């Protein structure tokens, strides 16, 4: 997606050969016009997949997930990292390791919002080692629902997440596939 590539080139900051900072438009400050384009693109890619729900993890996946949900006309569920007093029932949950935060947390979704008849699209801001995606897949399977695909805003293709998801047979659509962050330069897979 050229608009996303351009935004990454202009405002992304390479912190190391493993870390790309995009807080100017995606995961701290949000560019609504770009999120609309991202939602449009994911909706086009998955329009014929029978999606009934979108699932993401709070917080950075919420903006692209909402815009995709708006386009597809389906609800968006975000897995919570912190248990709320309002989440009182037995939760669907999984443990996830954050590559950038170097921490492990439990994410959870209420079983009231996900059923065995749902076809779920996972939307996330980044795909690195695939741990967040695997946690969401686990939660969706606990509900007996079907994973219809994954929409990733930025994929770090040099890490193993995509290969693992591909080997499990999941459809993965990434809007920006980063080949390398070497020497402070973002190189895309075109």
Curated annotation (Swiss-Prot):
Xanthine binds at residues 20, 27, 156. 5-phospho-alpha-D-ribose 1-diphosphate binds at residues 128-132. Keywords: Cytoplasm, Glycosyltransferase, Purine salvage, Transferase. It is found in: Cytoplasm. GO terms for cellular component: cytoplasm. Its EC number is 2.4.2.22. GO terms for molecular function: xanthine phosphoribosyltransferase activity. SUPFAM superfamilies: PRTase-like. It comes from the Bacteria. It catalyses: XMP + diphosphate = xanthine + 5-phospho-alpha-D-ribose 1-diphosphate. GO terms for biological process: purine ribonucleoside salvage; xanthine metabolic process; XMP salvage. Pathway: Purine metabolism; XMP biosynthesis via salvage pathway; XMP from xanthine: step 1/1. Its main location: cytoplasm. HAMAP family: XPRTase. Belongs to the purine/pyrimidine phosphoribosyltransferase family. Xpt subfamily. Converts the preformed base xanthine, a product of nucleic acid breakdown, to xanthosine 5'-monophosphate (XMP), so it can be reused for RNA or DNA synthesis. Homodimer. This is Xanthine phosphoribosyltransferase. It comes from Pseudomonas fluorescens (strain Pf0-1).
């Amino acid at each position: 997606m050229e608009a996303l590539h351009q935004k990454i080139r202009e405002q992304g900051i390479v912190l190391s050969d493993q870390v790309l900072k995009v807080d100017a438009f995606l995961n701290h400050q949000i560019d609504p016009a770009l999120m609309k384009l991202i939602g449009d693109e994911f909706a086009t890619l998955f329009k014929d997949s029978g999606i009934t729900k979108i699932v993401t993890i709070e917080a950075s996946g919420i903006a692209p997930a909402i815009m995709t949900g708006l386009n597809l006309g389906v609800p968006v569920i975000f897995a919570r990292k912190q248990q709320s007093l309002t989440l009182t029932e037995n939760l669907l949950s999984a443990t996830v390791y954050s590559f950038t935060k170097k921490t492990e947390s439990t994410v959870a979704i209420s079983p009231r919002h996900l059923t065995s008849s749902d076809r779920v699209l996972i939307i996330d801001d980044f795909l690195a080692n695939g741990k967040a995606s695997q946690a969401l897949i686990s939660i969706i399977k606990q509900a007996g629902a079907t994973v219809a695909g994954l929409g990733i805003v930025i994929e770090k293709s040099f890490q193993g997440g995509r290969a693992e998801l591909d080997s499990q047979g999941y459809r993965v659509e990434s809007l920006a596939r980063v080949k390398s962050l070497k020497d402070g330069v973002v190189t895309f897979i075109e």
